Amino acid sequence: MKSCHNFAKRQRALGLGVLGWHSLLQSKNIAFEGLEAQFLNAEIHNIIRERCDRATSKLAEEFGEPEHLRGYGKRNMTTMAIAPTTSSSFILGQVSPSIEPLNSNYFTKDLAKGKFTYKNPHLEQLLEEKGKNNTTTWKSILVKGGSVQHLDFLSEHEKDVFKTFGEISQKEIVIQAAQRQKYIDQGQSLNVMISPKCPPKQVSELLIFGWEQGVKSFYYQRSANPSQELARSILNCSSCEG
């Protein structure tokens, strides 16, 4: 405990992060894959970075600089980190966890007090507008593992907006992580979803690509949902084409 106390006292390290990234994109009708999402990603983390710098400088003026930061005009050694936020996201409005895409648009979750059924609220709103918010539609989504790619009344853009984790190019996820990393002074909880059938060479290439782009580390490598149609290749990405 003494070492923990000394660390906190001398460095005042913090780790401000984000949650609900995929939910935010869906609320704005923006597909996860593409330049529009990348522009918003950069804008958000640039603003957070600027405000963190401003806040830690102000705190240093009010409360002084800790031992390891004397002469730097800052109160905190670190200020930003991307945590998993799985529980926090569920509590704070059932939004998508952290920077991660939603694994499914419709699922049942076992909790201590019983089972909870999650329906993507942004998808539900869209289905309501189209007159398709009914049991038949949701049952078909459930059968497909939470995917909407089979719904013929949705446009291609709408299908892109509501792609699930395994349907999104994993390279796109890594590109966004690399893009925001330059604003973050610590690491990111960066997960990727890869089919067991994916060639090891592709997995290796994805990890090396992340390292080359400046990603500090990966977190979990998850197995893809077999009920969903997977992305053509983990190395493909919409923003890289054309």
Predicted regions: what is each one?
Residues 1-9, 13, 25-85, 156-159:
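Internal maturation/activation junctions in enzymes
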Residues 10-25, 169-183:
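Structured alpha-helical segments in the cores of large, soluble enzyme domains
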Residues 13-31, 202-215:
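Hydrophobic/aromatic-rich, well-ordered segments within soluble, folded domains that form packed cores
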Residues 20-32, 99, 148-154:
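Short, compositionally biased low-complexity segments
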Residues 23-26, 30, 46-65, 104, ...:
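Generic secondary-structure signature for well-ordered alpha-helical cores
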Residues 80-231, 235-242:
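Catalytic alpha/beta core of large soluble enzyme barrels
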